[in-house]
Amino acid sequence: MDKIIVEGGRTLSGEVQVSGAKNAALPILAASLLVDGWNTFYNVPELQDISTIGLLLEHLGAKVEKDGHTIKIDASGLCETEAPYDLVRRMRASVLVLGPLTARLKKARVSLPGGCAIGARPIDQHLRGLEMLGATVELSHGYVEVQAEKLRGADIYLDTPTVTGTENLMMAACLAEGVTILRNVAREPEIVALADLLNRMGGKVEGAGSPVLTITGVEALNPVEFTIIPDRIEAGTFMVAAALTEGDVLVKDAVPAHLQALISKLRLAGATVTEEGNGIRVQGKRPICSVDVKTLPHPGFPTDMQAQFMVLMTTAKGLSVIAETIFENRFIHVSELVRMGANISISQNSAVIRGVKHLSAAPVMATDLRASASLILAGLIAQGSTEIHRVYHIDRGYESIEQKFSQLGAAVRRVK
């Protein structure tokens, strides 16, 4: 099994190109199921999760052609309504086919999802929303079974602004009869990107980026060409790395509007963050100031940056508190950071970090996607050589991460 080895103590400098956003690409690729004809998607990252959803779409009857960062999909032959456990268990975002299948084929049978081991992450709001659109929903033998002879618009309030729930209901509502109003929806840039795609296809989605979406159903959607937005979490990871190593890094194609919460916290920590025409430049310096963080739905501080920012705080001056309000059980990486010498204690949904002078290299184990990124960051400042095991997690969400860090001057390599 692969492992990543990081030699600590190097300052990062130079430019790094941000890949397309996985969390935007997955629902956008799933949305191709709504359309007959060839859709062409550009700037698609080459990641394990992208490969997985490609296999799932092919299983459902779509044709999928891949050429580097371009993927073409034709769902004219869509015929299968079941997303089997063998595929869905690899990635919880597979549940995104639920809405499109219900809208196109009037039924869907999707295995309950897998992916990162971060708490329960239930899909009850997806299902309740589909019921309000007129579908019948049953849970049987580990599968969600949905049937809907005709979807009709409804006024739906989400108890929490679930991202995948918002996306599933947006896609289903586009082909429903009448007007659907979705309230308390997710406001992430990936939601805005999906709305842009659906509107390009001929859908009528209004309000993306606000708490309320209004979707007027149409008879059919049309195939399009579409470019995936840059990955704000990958960008944020490199921004933290620059601040952490006293580096000077231009993160190319990072979108400042997508990263305002992180930019604010990095500046409070003492980094210089400059918004440039082609990206975001971060210059780090020490001592790092301690900063408190509370994860919140967008535009708040993203939960997917919590683990990386925690590493920055491990050698900050003073005490900082990170409160996790989105997912339970998202401090699994803490025990690995403690093995490297970090002083972190957990109390309910908060981590209290007391800054130490330095971290020490140790063999560590990645437990989920963002935790594995945080361990690479910790290795960048640790004394000695850090070995990170179970790095298949990182391949689900970061494209060529060791090459990108290496081109910035880090000593990061993969050993098979």
Swiss-Prot record:
It is found in: Cytoplasm. It is an enzyme of class 2 (transferase). One of its GO terms (biological process) is peptidoglycan biosynthetic process. It catalyses: phosphoenolpyruvate + UDP-N-acetyl-alpha-D-glucosamine = UDP-N-acetyl-3-O-(1-carboxyvinyl)-alpha-D-glucosamine + phosphate. This is UDP-N-acetylglucosamine 1-carboxyvinyltransferase. Pfam families: EPSP_synthase. Phosphoenolpyruvate binds at residues 22-23. SUPFAM superfamilies: EPT/RTPC-like. GO terms for cellular component: cytoplasm. UDP-N-acetyl-alpha-D-glucosamine binds at residues 92, 121-125, 304, 326.
